[in-house]
Amino acid sequence: MSTVLPEDSVGLVTPQTARFDEPLALACGRSLASYELVYETYGSLNASASNAVLICHALSGHHHAAGYHATTDRKPGWWDSCIGPGKPIDTNRFFVVSLNNLGGCNGSTGPSSVNPATGKPYGADFPVLTVEDWVHSQARLADRLGIRQWAAIVGGSLGGMQALQWTMTYPDRVRHCVDIASAPKLSAQNIAFNEVARQAILTDPEFHGGSFQDQGVIPKRGLMLARMVGHITYLSDDSMGEKFGRELKSDKLNYDFHSVEFQVESYLRYQGEEFSGRFDANTYLLMTKALDYFDPAAANGGDLAATLAHVTADYCIMSFTTDWRFSPARSREIVDALMAARKNVCYLEIDSPYGHDAFLIPTPRYMQGFANYMNRIAI
């Protein structure tokens, strides 16, 4: 059934594909001879190309950040609450670019793509990627679109790490960095969660060493468990308690190990089932490794202020009080380093019950603070 699109929507959008035939050297020592990036754009690029904003996605994100692909779509893009006319990233002012990162599974070249050298899917042979690899590939997309400098680069979670990396790798190509619910590197606990998720996939009998496509199967159980573990870390204890508590699906206990008895069990299984049907297992492994490897200050003995000494962008750092995956303390590490390096930075810590997922949820103070900063950006 067709729906009437909201007035503050960017409307119907069509994904585009950019192909690059110049080899891309990667941090792992390998290279990709050619690759494709799928992206969407919203709004119009002005004559001086000074109003461009790049959206960097998180672990399971993709290029479809706003609008609709068809009037029959049940939901808009994943960040539609923040991108559109009159929204924080106002498409009446900005030309917005959102892409599916290299290694993804939504159209950009990744493990599920055909390796031209073999005629088969890359699978586990796809090279391991880093955040800086993504930034280099994104810079090539900017060149292709005629964008010399971004007015702003915006991202939440892993997307925020990409935004931060941009300001270090290409300091003269970024005027503003909006880094939301992120961190300067993962804690040991976060790496541990990622490893549990990876082991769920790697030990699934249907994984076949990453060559499951050749076998005509998917490691559904492993992906499901990985998503269930990950999803717990995206929510706060308060929000889970309020949403589910100890409510049962029926009015009695079954006294077995197979029934789905609690509402929270049902929710996690649904999330896992849905995710396992749309996401690639090898991509999940790649994304979590890129998270683990992100540590830009390592080259300076862990001194983040020294690492940021050469940056020229202005920064807006936002965090959420109940986010325990990337707590406010992690955002303040970035803020403190920027201040020590004498850079321009503003910081907003937002009261929210929604945990790490709060960066996706349009609460009033978040939207107001986000919009206030974006409206200050000269174009």
UniProtKB/Swiss-Prot annotation:
Recorded metabolic or biological pathway in which this protein acts: Amino-acid biosynthesis; L-methionine biosynthesis via de novo pathway; O-succinyl-L-homoserine from L-homoserine: step 1/1
Name of the top EC class for this enzyme: transferase
Entries under InterPro entries matching the protein: AB_hydrolase_1 (IPR000073), AB_hydrolase_fold (IPR029058), HAT_MetX-like (IPR008220)
GO molecular function: homoserine O-acetyltransferase activity; homoserine O-succinyltransferase activity
Keyword DNA-binding: no
Active site per UniProt: 157, 323, 356
UniProt xrefs under SUPFAM superfamilies: alpha/beta-Hydrolases
Localization per Swiss-Prot or TrEMBL: Cytoplasm
Disulphide bonds in the chain: none
Record-listed substrate binding positions: 227, 357
Domain AB hydrolase-1: 51-360
Alphabetic keyword roster: Acyltransferase, Amino-acid biosynthesis, Cytoplasm, Methionine biosynthesis, Transferase
Reactions this protein catalyses: L-homoserine + succinyl-CoA = O-succinyl-L-homoserine + CoA
Superkingdom, taxonomy of origin: Bacteria
Gene Ontology CC annotations of this record: cytoplasm
Annotated site residues (Important for acyl-CoA specificity) in this chain: 325
Gene Ontology biological-process entries: homoserine metabolic process; methionine biosynthetic process
EC number: 2.3.1.46
Subunit structure, as described in the record: Homodimer.
Family: Belongs to the AB hydrolase superfamily. MetX family.
Function statement: Transfers a succinyl group from succinyl-CoA to L-homoserine, forming succinyl-L-homoserine.
Name of the molecule in the record: Homoserine O-succinyltransferase
Species name: Pseudomonas putida (strain W619)
Gene (name only): metXS
